Amino acid sequence: MASALSNASRRGVAVRLAFNVDHANPIPVPPPPGGEPSVIDGLDVPTKPIPGVPDLMHHKYVVRDGEAVWTGSTNWTDDSWSREENVIAVVESTGVAHSYSTDFEQLWSTGDVAQSGFVDPNPIKVDGKRVRAWFAPGRGEAMAIRIAHRVARAKTRIRVSSPVLTSAPILGALAEAVSDGKVDIAGVVDATQMKGVYHQWMLNGNSDWKVPLIARVLGGAPFSGKLSTPYGQGDVHDYMHAKVTVADDIVFIGSYNLSHSGEVNAENVLEIRDAELADRLAAFVDEIRARYPAAPLPA
């Protein structure tokens, strides 16, 4: 990837790279990606470090020539490509590219996560399909509520793939759907990271009210959990990292973990109404969850 960026610059392409900068605060759950400073420093392109304080610059997207967007859950690290479950979406649309370019300019001009994501999620037609681009933190709360709304309105199926699951509106919608028992619901999380979430909840006591919700969701529907390697410098990073929600024929795909903290990170999500794509991604979620045992429940 580094070579591709440098080669594009040498061809005369205007390349800019914004990236998250680590900080000394406690490691969040899920943990941020680990970049290689020497690789970034060696790039022959303008770069912009975005301080991940207090909230992460968590995007993984590219805008090409104002015509296409490459996005999803995949960090640009070796382990992301070889050891983790991830998703990538490529959208050829000037309208979608404009939305992503607007978000990028907000980050680039301010260098501040909190000043980005203020992009209206207006519907855009792409090959006859309706697409909306959501960004956080500017539209983070609305983004989570939108996903929860679609989950609550689902009539036939819900599929979820997310390293963690802590967003209150989404948890509430899932718990209600599981309790109603009218919709085919299944999903997959990262077991190690969910155990970390439970530990944090136990220590701070501020999220005790979420415990029955997550227990209802993970215990009442077939959710699996990948027992990944715990986070640590130099360790293997093999998380279950795909971020996908399918509600009937609507897909949400991007960088956003279904977490409360994700609402204030720099994040992006594509909402796509496409029955064929929904079938494909629902099958992908089922393929992942078939690999792993049942997700852990809070003690």
Predicted regions and their residues:
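PLD/PLD-like phosphodiesterase catalytic module centered on the HKD motif
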Residues: 2-69, 74, 78-83, 90-109, ...
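Short, contiguous strand/loop micro-motifs
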Residues: 24, 133-135, 161
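Active-site cores of enzymes that catalyze phosphoryl transfer or operate on phosphate-rich substrates
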Residues: 109-138
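Extracellular/periplasmic Venus flytrap/periplasmic-binding protein
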Residues: 130-153
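Long, repeat-rich segments with strong aromatic
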Residues: 155, 162-165
